[in-house]
């Protein structure tokens, strides 16, 4: 097999070395010419895999190490008989860790008690569904809007987007980017909806940049709108709007799901799909390539405050403010310089582990145990 992989996909050799020759390119450089002699294509969301790129190529399998598939022309895949796989849920936990870090930063700035907020989660799939589980596990009030899932689960606890925007004072977006169809999500939060948000609302977008009208959001913030905003995704990536970023509390270069586990899990999942497509046995597993965590565990004093424990456990693993600082330093120079810096921050992202790998002792204190379980850490 002739395999072409995005150079930023990790451990490709560990999984695919015995399957043929492997060539690597930057994801944004993968085009029609690059696919002339390729059987298997492994990509991330930065590569548009379209009819124009694939027509006439020998590509027969496409794997994307992402949850979303809006960069894949699935209609053409079906027409051309091209097998494909995404990696659903691969980085979901990393995104949840990111959102929790943003909420802690917002609470610190606002002097707010996270337990007293009402949370609105838009999109309850792989990422949003996990976030809902964590928030409800902590005992917090959560509203969920997901029209496609509501249609499949008519007895589920769902609300309309209008009700969610009216009642929630924390909104976290986790939808795919759908430009058409029954439930389009491009500019789901457009100028009228953004302008109608309650004063003091916190908004987190770690889904796709165009789910929020970036220009409308910038105008509102420039006009003094009382919002706290955390953006990990941007319209026109890798070109992020520096003026919008300057008005966000947290601004990062599409790294919410960049946990080490998430990256390796994505490669493992497309390898599993590839093996199924070829009808061969899997030779390597995720556990074969996942290194030991740097922080083995934490011991909480049974008398500590649960809110302090929550913040400490989350930040022991990840604090998005470090990524925010690095991103802001990159928002200088001309457009080409900023675009290159955006991709460089992603390419050279430092190892970051998920909270699920953290072992926590609580001395048997029930409320602390509830926090640990809700976060998904390992209770010992």
From Swiss-Prot:
One of its GO terms (molecular function) is protein dimerization activity. It catalyses: 4-phospho-D-erythronate + NAD(+) = (R)-3-hydroxy-2-oxo-4-phosphooxybutanoate + NADH + H(+). Homodimer. This is Erythronate-4-phosphate dehydrogenase. Belongs to the D-isomer specific 2-hydroxyacid dehydrogenase family. PdxB subfamily. Substrate binds at residues 45, 66, 258. It is found in: Cytoplasm. Keywords: Cytoplasm, Disulfide bond, NAD, Oxidoreductase, Pyridoxine biosynthesis. NCBIfam families: PRK00257.1. It is an enzyme of class 1 (oxidoreductase). NAD(+) binds at residues 126-127, 146, 175, 206-208, 232, 257. Each subunit can be divided into three discernible structural domains: the lid domain, the nucleotide-binding domain, and the C-terminal dimerization domain. PdxB has a unique dimeric structure among NAD-dependent D-isomer specific 2-hydroxyacid dehydrogenases due to the presence of its dimerization domain at its C-terminus. One of its GO terms (cellular component) is cytosol. Catalyzes the oxidation of erythronate-4-phosphate to 3-hydroxy-2-oxo-4-phosphonooxybutanoate. It comes from Pseudomonas aeruginosa (strain ATCC 15692 / DSM 22644 / CIP 104116 / JCM 14847 / LMG 12228 / 1C / PRS 101 / PAO1). Disulfide bonds join 65-90.
